[in-house]
Amino acid sequence: MKWGGRLFLALALVATGAAGQAGAATLSVGPGQAYALPSRAIAAARDGDTVAIAPGTYHDCAIVRRNRLTIEGTGPGVVLAGRSCAGKGILIIDANDVTVKDLTLQGAVVPDGNGSGIRAEGGGTLTVEGVRFVDNQDGILAAANPRAVLRVLGSRFVGNGSCANAGGCAHAIYAGPIGTLDVERSRFRDTREGHSIKSRAARTIVKDCTIADGPDGTSSYQIDVPNGGDVLIEGNRLEKGPKSQNRRNAIMIGEEGVTQPTKSLVVKDNTLVDDTGWPTVFVHNETATPAVLAGNVFKGGTVVPLVGPGTVR
């Protein structure tokens, strides 16, 4: 192809990309807006669109089937509550590379015990930023997909979790066998019975979070990584409260059998406050991979830094 032809092709490709970006629409939800309910805007959206939701409480749920969709609140007090779609949860993400921002998802309860603020069933990267999860069975439940990435940034989880279902417990975050779970700058409080974070991902990252039972939380583990995988837990503040359902361990790794390749287990620069009144193990490692613990600080009751292979420094 001659230079002129190459230049024409390059310009055409740039123009096509620009047109694709320009074609993305913002669908507005709220009183006096084009859509009265988030679910209607989400159903009408196309790939790459933004659904912008005005403050208010919406008794609504939705199934997301558009890739690269952004669902965001336009101000404080955007609440989706009291309804679950397909017997699963409030937002069911069956698409790739979706972003959910600045919402509250509240009160997801379904008969099987896994009512989720967000049920992640798609691929690519699901980004959850600035979202509050309140009184759900699962805050976020991510289905098995080895190529999926779940990123949770600057979000809050209050009163999530349940062990009411005979089939097992629900958790504030429960990631199935996905590629990566990355939770950063988020806060967990008053988790009920289940774990604050349970991850079967190939790679689990928890950084700069606060995970606290408080006086009334009844969580089991603060962080559970039952099948191994690479782990980085850094810069967090953990607190086990007096009503914890499992006072013996804060972080558990590999107790259900190691099915993920496990090359690196690093737990550093965290603080554990033990308010249980019982001796507590900070990290219980049941994999064959040595855990590296460094710079961790323990307050309150008696804390055993590590059970299982690894080093403490």
Protein language model regions, located:
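Bacterial N-terminal signal peptides that target proteins for export
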Residues: 1-9
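Bacterial N-terminal signal peptides
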Residues: 8-17
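Boundary at the C-terminal end of the N-terminal hydrophobic targeting segment
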Residues: 20-24
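Acidic Gly/Asp/Thr-rich repetitive segments characteristic of extracellular carbohydrate-active
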Residues: 26-60
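Residue-level detector of conserved, well-ordered beta-strand and adjacent loop positions
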Residues: 30, 54, 72, 81, ...
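Extracellular beta-strand-rich solenoid/capping regions of secreted or surface-exposed proteins
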Residues: 47, 58-71, 79-101, 106-124, ...
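Right-handed parallel beta-helix
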Residues: 68, 72-78, 96-107, 124-135, ...
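Extracellular beta-strand/beta-solenoid scaffold signature
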Residues: 82-91, 111-120, 135-144, 164-175, ...
